[in-house]
Design a protein with these regions (language model features):
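Patatin-like phospholipase
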Residues: 1-26, 34-265
């Protein structure tokens, strides 16, 4: 739920009509970034607050029943279609490009996808794939590939967006300045449960190296005036899947405050 920090930033940007030409979302950034394009202020916090205690949304019951911590059908289709509708019309009319990043579990390569109208079942499946956490999600099959969380292969896709022609980029991190990633302590679990996907095991074993290199590149681009960085001042007081309403609201508020500071509002 660290992504609610991003949601807070995007809501402030919408409220103050701060427009960008494109967004690339990774993992929770894909789930929440689409709301910027559809101009739905408050939607990300609202549905997460409303659904936090609903076993149909996410939790151990879903994981045991389906192998997915986030219920694939309910969270990514029923919710945006019926319960808290995603504004498909506004998304389709927007000039803002929306891209997501996934990881091919066979090759270990990042897979980039620009999502355009119509906002249909496959559209939401790409968002699901980008945010499908390893170990607690089945790979999502799209375009002949098996896909999981994009953060495994490209956590900070700044170079990708620069190659798309975006010369100055606002980069939102959910870790504070000075953070350096260490090798995950979950490697025994990856080796035990991801044997079918050796590329994923290798990715996770060296992900900290790739991530820290991306941080160095981001710092270089920021110094050169080609990137604006927004990050929390302190470690966000919430876990990736934690569903405490109080903590979710706090993290969202921290995002809003970070945006107000970054844009001098």
């Amino acid at each position: 739920m660290r992504g609610l920090f991003t949601a807070g930033i995007l809501d402030v940007m919408m409220e103050h009509d701060i427009k960008v030409d494109g967004i690339v979302g990774v993992s929770a950034g894909a789930c929440f970034g689409c709301n910027y394009v559809s101009r739905q202020i408050g939607r990300a916090l609202r549905y997460n607050m409303n659904m936090k205690d609903d076993p149909r949304y996410m939790g151990i019951r879903s994981l045991i029943r389906s192998g997915n911590l986030m219920d694939a059908e309910f969270a990514y289709h029923t919710l945006p279609d019926e319960i808290d509708p995603f504004d498909k019309k506004t998304f389709a009319q927007s000039s803002t490009e929306f891209h997501v990043v996934c990881t091919d579990v066979i090759t270990g390569d990042p897979v980039y996808k620009r999502l355009t109208a119509p906002v249909d079942y496959e559209f939401m499946e790409w968002i699901r794939a980008s945010s499908a956490l390893p170990l607690v999600s089945h790979p999502v099959e799209l375009d002949g590939r098996l896909l999981l969380d994009g953060g495994m292969s490209d956590s900070i896709p700044l170079k990708y967006f620069q190659k798309q022609g975006f010369e100055h980029n606002i980069v939102i991190l959910t870790q504070p300045l000075g953070f350096t990633k260490k090798r995950t302590k979950l490697m025994p679990l990856f080796r035990a449960f991801m044997k079918k996907y050796p590329a994923v095991i290798e990715l996770m074993n060296r992900r900290h190296i790739m991530y820290n290199a991306q941080l160095e590149y981001l710092a270089h681009e920021q110094q050169a005036g080609r990137a604006t960085l927004i990050a929390p001042d302190d470690t966000l007081p919430i876990g990736r899947t934690q569903q405490s309403g109080k903590r979710m609201q706090l993290v969202y508020k921290m995002g809003r405050e970070a945006a107000e500071k970054a844009f001098s509002l």
